[in-house]
């Protein structure tokens, strides 16, 4: 950014403070020489923010009222996430001398609160400590099923097939994302 004396400067606390904790459970089972199964569950908790300096930011973009004739201000903002991501994957596998077959799928869900705060502004307008300039709860669900097969027709020729069906759904509504549904 450029300071009031015209010098190019960098914000000292430009930072990314985001943490994720991951938890997983895996189960593999050999049923016979030809059959086995795999099952996994996962959960990730994420929380944190990044902070940066915005030069000449429009008051309107932050839900703030202009101060006198000023329509913009330098400010420091934080963009926060507090989210959960969880799901499962599974498959059944068959393997013989001529056929390899995998049938499986997955289901995952993301749920996250996203919000932004102005923590400092050169012209403070009517903002209060802790005010949010956007606030959103977003979700994403993703489910799929698949079948993969490889059949050995001869020593040099094999036949391969892969089918998948997938459904993905997003939902969000904020100044940052617009309406997503």
Predicted regions span which residues?
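The feature captures the short pre-catalytic strand/loop hairpin that immediately precedes
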Residues: 5
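Face-selective signature of the C-terminal outer-membrane beta-barrel domain
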Residues: 17-177
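Active-site rim elements
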Residues: 9-14
């Amino acid at each position: 950014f450029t300071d009031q004396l015209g010098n190019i400067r960098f914000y000292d606390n430009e930072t990314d403070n985001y943490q994720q904790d991951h938890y997983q459970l895996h189960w593999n089972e050999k049923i016979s020489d030809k059959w086995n199964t795999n099952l996994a569950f996962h959960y990730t908790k994420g929380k944190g923010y990044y902070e940066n300096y915005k030069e000449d930011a429009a008051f309107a973009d932050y839900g703030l009222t202009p101060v006198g004739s000023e329509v913009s201000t330098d400010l420091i903002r934080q963009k926060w996430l507090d989210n959960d991501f969880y799901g499962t994957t599974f498959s059944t596998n068959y393997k013989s001398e001529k056929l390899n077959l995998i049938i499986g799928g997955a289901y995952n869900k993301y749920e996250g609160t996203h919000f932004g705060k102005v923590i400092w502004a050169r012209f403070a307008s009517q903002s209060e400590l802790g005010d949010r300039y956007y606030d959103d709860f977003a979700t994403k669900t993703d489910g799929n099923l698949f079948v993969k097969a490889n059949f050995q027709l001869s020593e040099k020729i094999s036949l391969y097939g892969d089918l998948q069906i997938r459904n993905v759904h997003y939902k969000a509504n904020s100044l940052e994302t617009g309406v997503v549904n």
